[in-house]
Every structure is written in structure tokens, then in C-alpha cells.
Amino acid sequence: MPSHRSALDNSAVAVVIPVKAFHQAKERLSDLLTPAERIVLAKYCADRVINAARNFDIFVVCDDPDVAQWARDHKTKIVWQPEIGLNAAVREGVKFAATQNKQLAIVSHSDLPLATEFEHLINDQSAETLLSSVTLVPDRHEDGTNVMVVPTNFDFDFSYGKNSFAAHQKMAKKYGLSVRILHDSSLAVDIDTADDLAVAQQLEN
């Protein structure tokens, strides 16, 4: 029976997860959830992402002591990057992964409540394909980029925010990297609005 594993060993792959301070997370849900409930939600989502990444070395990029302690409790590596913004934080996380001999980085948002695993993003792909391409997993609106897979030897200019899905495709082509797009319902739902939360609860049930 043929193997479904990637030709690139998991030890060469990092999962990079930028994590915002839990007490600052999900402020757009303040009309629906109390501050304590928002912290619980943020930690629940982040725990799901960490568990989904369990078969890889995990690098949590953060600038908050509570998040750093949470990351230690999960036995992840910590990339401390105070107050530099999401795009720069991801860039530094990927750079640090490269210094740890990681050839590939799976970059994931921390607010994916339905995440179960990341292996399928690289399975059945040759090392040559993975190291010469960018894999994008868009959100359910095909506007944002919830997860992406990038080679660590490119100084990729991350462009998270509105229309990042399109922006990351353009950036990949600028670097001469091919683009793989994977639609995945378990990774497409991130929690920014009450509607997102309702969709996640419906799909979870």
C-alpha cells in the first residue's frame, strides 16, 4: 500500500502560531461575551490548534507573559516578539524556525476552533513541491488566510489582514513560488464575529 506521508520528514517542519494576549483577544465579541468568557474562548481555540500541531515542533510567537506560560505548559518553543504586529511576528517566527533547521513552516492562526490536524497539508507531496510552493488555506469567505505553508528559506512578506488570501497569492508569484490552494472546512472557520462563533458551534455539533 502506498504511503500517504510527505516526502519531507515532520522533523523538518515547524508549526508557527502567533498568539495574541488572551485578555485582549476577541474584543469584537464584547457585546456577546464577558471578558472572562472571551479569555476562555481564546484559550479553547488556541488549545485546539496546538493539539492539531502535535506531530510537529511548535513555535508560539507572543509578547504576553500569560501566553508564554501557556506555551511552556504545552511544551512549545517560544519566540518572544514584543509589540511588532502580526505580519512582523510571523516573519520572525518563520525566521527563527529556519535557525532550528526547519525547512518548512506551517503558519496558523490561533483562533481555529475546528482544527484537528495539519499533516494533510503536506501529505502526498514531494519535498521538491513543498519547498518550491506556498500552500494557502483561506477562511470561509476566501478573504483571509487562516493557514499557510511556506519554505523557510524565503524572506516571505506576510500580508495578513483584509484580502490577505489574494495578497499572499501575489506575493508567492513574486518570489517565483507556485501556489497550492486547499479548501478545508475544519480550518476555514476562525472566530472574529458573532456569526463566526455561530457557524463554529453549528459545525462542531
What are these regions (language model features)?
Residues 29-37:
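Short glycine-enriched, charge-decorated loop/helix-capping segments at active-site entrances
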Residues 115-142:
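Conserved donor-nucleotide/metal-binding helix-loop-beta segment in metal-dependent transferases, i.e.
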Residues 72-106, 185:
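Short phosphate-binding loop-to-helix
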Residues 109-113:
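The conserved acidic donor/metal-binding loop of glycosyltransferases
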Residues 40-57:
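A short, N-terminal amphipathic alpha-helix
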Residues 2-8, 163-205:
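Conserved alpha/beta core of the MobA/IspD/sugar-nucleotide pyrophosphorylase nucleotidyltransferase superfamily
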Residues 56-77:
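Acidic donor-binding segment of Leloir-type glycosyltransferases
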Residues 1-29:
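N-terminal nucleotide-binding beta1-loop-alpha1 segment
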